[in-house]
């Protein structure tokens, strides 16, 4: 497969030029205007942020993309699907309230917001996975599959189960209905290292399934209740909660890539990722830790695989921030350094598996040419 082109611009802004101006210029250079949008529904998939989290993308960025679509005669809407776990985005009403509280509405974004899998997270379509190895079909939010054109607008950051969250995670996990998310997560569940557990109860507070109790001041997981979402792993400050089988994370990664294939196959797609506020964990948390790496810039491509690879490569070249989770890990005596910021931030992850599987099934290529836009 030939190299894909990924376009990049940094966050440096001379007087009179804003980040929003640069984002618009980036999208145009990357070819968004080559898509025929006249009279067509355009799904712009993004994450509206959990209440309390401040690392999610600002709605101003979404408006740039929505306005570009409208300029081309498109009918854009912002979308995301409900979460597997309880929180502020587990059903459409609370999800819309959360989006509004985090600044997403028709005024700030220039378009409507539609929750992709409906009121209860059950409005889904079973979509074939072309070349699927682990998933023959995927359960995707109905509204997302109803769109004629699909655009992903992703916040690239760390993730406690997948290493990082970028375009493929935003598409694959994010577009899955609640049942679709369960299908992806079903392969792996965390364990407790009782020698390290301090009984602080942070994992229990983070668990949305009421699956963690305490016996003799040590956490205990009820696997009949556990959904395998991994939020408890990110909640623990002492690395007491871990995935006992790294292959489970790898299977999650590969399923996620196949779900992304189901979403993108057979229609025009365009992908944008902003590498900023690079927190160590997912924006699904009701908080965000300090960034582990400095802000890098904005990337865009028709190829989500090349896009994620380019973003990952840029992060791996960056210098870790000392006063951060990653900085603290690297400063620990005896810490096993992987020379990989994602693995040093969240051990027992296999982030390359997502890209490998996506390339294997024909979603895109990891080989890319980077073109810089000023």
Model-identified regions with their sequence ranges:
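Extended, low-polarity segments enriched in aliphatic/aromatic residues
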Residues: 2-61, 71-80, 85-374
